[in-house]
Every structure is written in C-alpha cells, then in structure tokens.
Amino acid sequence: MAQPGTLNLNNEVVKMRKEVKRIRVLVIRKLVRSVGRLKSKKGTEDALLKNQRRAQRLLEEIHAMKELKPDIVTKSALGDDINFEKIFKKPDSTATERAIARLAVHPLLKKKIDVLKAAVQAFKEARQNVAEVESSKNASEDNHSENTLYSNDNGSNLQREATVISEQKVKETKILAKKPIHNSKEKIAKMEHGPKAVTIANSPSKPSEKDSVVSLESQKTPADPKLKTLSQTKKNKGSDSSLSGNSDGGEEFCEEEKEYFDDSTEERFYKQSSMSEDSDSGDDFFIGKVRRTRKKESSCHSSVKEQKPLEKVFLKEDTGETHGDTRNDKIKPSTETRKLESVFFHSLSGSKSSRRNFKEQAPKTRSLDFPQNEPQIKNQFNKKLSGRLENTKQQLQLPLHPSWEASRRRKEQQSNIAVFQGKKITFDD
C-alpha cells in the first residue's frame, strides 16, 4: 500500500477495482448455490413460499451486484462502518444496499479496506504534524529574518566604516610614497658624492702600496739583463691584453683587493730594501717606476696574480726579521736563487737548453722503459687470471639459491631413474 506521506485515495480506489470484481464473482457463485438449495427444499406450503421469497430476494441482489461499479463499493466501505445484520433487518432496505453490504463484509475485501483506513488515518496525522511544523518554522523564520535585518544594518554600518578607513589608509600611503621618492633622490645624490670621496681617500694610499710593490720586485728581479727584458715584455703584453678584455669592472675589484695591505708590511719592506746591498738597486727602481705607470692602466686580473706571490713573500719576510741578522744572511742566497723564477710566468724559470734536452730525452726513455716493463706486465696479467679462477671456484662452492638447488636435485633424480626393462604389452597379446 501507499505510504501516508504520498497517499492518493483516488489511486488506491482504482487499484481496488480488480479485488472488488474478483470478490463479486465469488459472492454471486455463493448466492446462486443458496438459491438452488432454497428451491429444492420440500416441506409445507408455508415453508415453500418462504423459501421462494428468500430465493427471489437473492436473485435481486445478484442482479444489483452485476450492475454495481467497483468504485462505489470501495468508497462506501471506506466511508461508513457497514453492519450487515442491521441492513438485513430493515424492512425497507433495497437490493443495492444489501449487495454493497454483502461485498463489503467479505473477509478478503474487509482486510484491504482496513489497511486503507489505517493509511488514511496516518496520512491525516502526518498532515497535521506537518502543519504544526510549518507553523513553527514560519515563526522561527520570522524571528530569523528580524535578526538578519538587524545584522545586515550593523554589517552595512561596519562596511561603511571599513571603506572610510581604507580610503584614509590609501591616502596616507600615497603621501608616504611621495616622500620616499624625494628621500631616495637625496640618497642617490649622496651616494654619487660618496664614491668620489672614497676614491680620493684611497688615492693617497696607492703610492705607498706601489712603492712597496716596487721594493718587492726589486728583490725578485733576475740578475741577468736578458731575463729582465723578457719578463718586462711579457708583463707589458699581459697588461695590454687584460686592458682590452676587462676595462670596466677591473678597477673596482683592484681597489677592494689593495685594501688588504698593512702599513706594517710596507715599513718592513722599506727596511729590507734599504738594507739590501745588491748592485742592481738603481735599475730595479727604474723598472719599478715603469711598472707603476703600467699598473695604472692594468686590469684586475694582473693585480690579483701579483698579490698571491706578494702575500707569500710577506710571510717569509716576517719570519726572517724575528730570527735576526743571521737568519737574513741565510735567506739572501735563497732569494738569489729565486731571482731566476718569474713572478707571472713560471715557464720562464727554466732555461731553454733544459727544455730542449727534456724533449730530446723523452722519446728515448719511453722506448727504453717499454721492453723492461714487459715481464712485469705479464706477471700482473697472470696474477689477475689466477685470482679470477679462484673467485669462480669459490662462487661454485658457495650455497646456491633454494630454487636453483631444487632444479639441480630434480635433474639428478631424472638422470638416476632406471630405464624400463619389462615387456611391452601389445594388442595382439
């Protein structure tokens, strides 16, 4: 049956038509049998007349049932509580009333009607509950709408205040943004004047540094005039090439690197230069002047290369002064030996004859060493082969994987199975 929430009584009545027709057929069959029994009874004339009247009444009910529509039967059964005995005791009851009462009282139809009545009652109760719930919802919605109106008013006021505050903040930020622009311009102007002052401050320190470099190079310059000229020409070439490559960013980096020199080291080198008794001091001073003019145009790359050997010499000179004059006398021959080494190009430190001899001797030594090394190579090869064989033997002796071991055992068992030696049976036997 239909649920009370979705009950439609007309649809239920239409669904009951088949049931009513089936019950009507059953009731008519029963009435026909009873009419036949009443007519077949025997007795007195009064009893026979009574039976004939009953049979006639039943025939009228049968004809009324045939003309009745099933919807009328179901609606009358749902509407009123039909009592069959009361209707039959009435003397003025019609055949249709009796026919409807007979059909409604039938037990099959009565069950269906009772279920429909319960569904209708539940549907009515549900409708009442829904109405109560809707009324409560409407009341709550009214209260909620009032609250939302108040909240919307408050929210609109807050939004207006927030917009006013945001507009004020935007104006303040614009004003502040204009001020830093002027400040930044002033800072840029200061920064432009600043580097000039820095360069002016650093410029007095350059001559002293360059003098120290000249004094160092006076110790490092070779004694032979040929080597002097070679090193000088190489330096000039390197400075010209570096000028073409790095002209912009070199000067700044050089100034940063030159700031690492200390005044103490400069004074020490002045002392060393004054104490030195070399005969070529005048020439070294002249060469230092020339280099000073070249260094003004040189790039950062050459200055960085100069500083690395200079720092090493600083450390060595410090140790020399602490140990005294006796230590200085020992250091002088070592410095004289170093005079043959070039500061920038280490390839010039050796003589040309030594390089030629090395080139001539190199192929001879290679050709001589090869046959001598042959037996050693053979011995090494034999050792490697023997080691590999031992490794393979050890690997064979190691325990195998369970799957490999099982397959090996299975193969052994198959090889051990004896060949069938009995007599083959044929169909002829």
From Swiss-Prot:
<dbReference type="InterPro" id="IPR037393">
    <property type="entry name" value="Bud22/SRFB1"/>
</dbReference>
<feature type="coiled-coil region">
    <location>
        <begin position="108"/>
        <end position="146"/>
    </location>
</feature>
<feature type="compositionally biased region" description="Polar residues">
    <location>
        <begin position="146"/>
        <end position="157"/>
    </location>
</feature>
<keyword id="KW-0832">Ubl conjugation</keyword>
<comment type="subunit">
    <text>Interacts with SRF. Forms complexes with SRF and SRF cofactors ARID2, MYOCD and NKX2-5. Interacts with the N-terminus of SLC2A4.</text>
</comment>
<feature type="modified residue" description="Phosphoserine">
    <location>
        <position position="203"/>
    </location>
</feature>
<feature type="coiled-coil region">
    <location>
        <begin position="42"/>
        <end position="67"/>
    </location>
</feature>
<dbReference type="GO" id="GO:0030686">
    <property type="term" value="C:90S preribosome"/>
</dbReference>
<keyword id="KW-0963">Cytoplasm</keyword>
<feature type="modified residue" description="Phosphoserine">
    <location>
        <position position="351"/>
    </location>
</feature>
<feature type="modified residue" description="Phosphoserine">
    <location>
        <position position="205"/>
    </location>
</feature>
<keyword id="KW-0597">Phosphoprotein</keyword>
<feature type="compositionally biased region" description="Basic and acidic residues">
    <location>
        <begin position="357"/>
        <end position="367"/>
    </location>
</feature>
<keyword id="KW-0804">Transcription</keyword>
<dbReference type="GO" id="GO:0048471">
    <property type="term" value="C:perinuclear region of cytoplasm"/>
</dbReference>
<dbReference type="Pfam" id="PF09073">
    <property type="entry name" value="BUD22"/>
</dbReference>
<dbReference type="GO" id="GO:0030490">
    <property type="term" value="P:maturation of SSU-rRNA"/>
</dbReference>
<feature type="modified residue" description="N-acetylalanine">
    <location>
        <position position="2"/>
    </location>
</feature>
<keyword id="KW-0805">Transcription regulation</keyword>
<comment type="function">
    <text>May be involved in regulating transcriptional activation of cardiac genes during the aging process. May play a role in biosynthesis and/or processing of SLC2A4 in adipose cells.</text>
</comment>
<protein>
    <recommendedName>
        <fullName>Serum response factor-binding protein 1</fullName>
    </recommendedName>
</protein>
<feature type="modified residue" description="Phosphoserine">
    <location>
        <position position="349"/>
    </location>
</feature>
<feature type="modified residue" description="Phosphoserine">
    <location>
        <position position="264"/>
    </location>
</feature>
<keyword id="KW-0175">Coiled coil</keyword>
<feature type="modified residue" description="Phosphoserine">
    <location>
        <position position="281"/>
    </location>
</feature>
<feature type="modified residue" description="Phosphoserine">
    <location>
        <position position="367"/>
    </location>
</feature>
<feature type="modified residue" description="Phosphoserine">
    <location>
        <position position="279"/>
    </location>
</feature>
<feature type="cross-link" description="Glycyl lysine isopeptide (Lys-Gly) (interchain with G-Cter in SUMO2)">
    <location>
        <position position="190"/>
    </location>
</feature>
<dbReference type="GO" id="GO:0003723">
    <property type="term" value="F:RNA binding"/>
</dbReference>
<feature type="compositionally biased region" description="Acidic residues">
    <location>
        <begin position="249"/>
        <end position="265"/>
    </location>
</feature>
<keyword id="KW-0007">Acetylation</keyword>
<feature type="cross-link" description="Glycyl lysine isopeptide (Lys-Gly) (interchain with G-Cter in SUMO2)">
    <location>
        <position position="316"/>
    </location>
</feature>
<dbReference type="InterPro" id="IPR015158">
    <property type="entry name" value="Bud22_dom"/>
</dbReference>
<keyword id="KW-1017">Isopeptide bond</keyword>
<feature type="compositionally biased region" description="Basic and acidic residues">
    <location>
        <begin position="183"/>
        <end position="195"/>
    </location>
</feature>
<feature type="region of interest" description="Disordered">
    <location>
        <begin position="131"/>
        <end position="157"/>
    </location>
</feature>
<feature type="region of interest" description="Disordered">
    <location>
        <begin position="176"/>
        <end position="429"/>
    </location>
</feature>
<feature type="compositionally biased region" description="Basic and acidic residues">
    <location>
        <begin position="296"/>
        <end position="341"/>
    </location>
</feature>
<dbReference type="GO" id="GO:0005634">
    <property type="term" value="C:nucleus"/>
</dbReference>
<feature type="compositionally biased region" description="Polar residues">
    <location>
        <begin position="373"/>
        <end position="383"/>
    </location>
</feature>
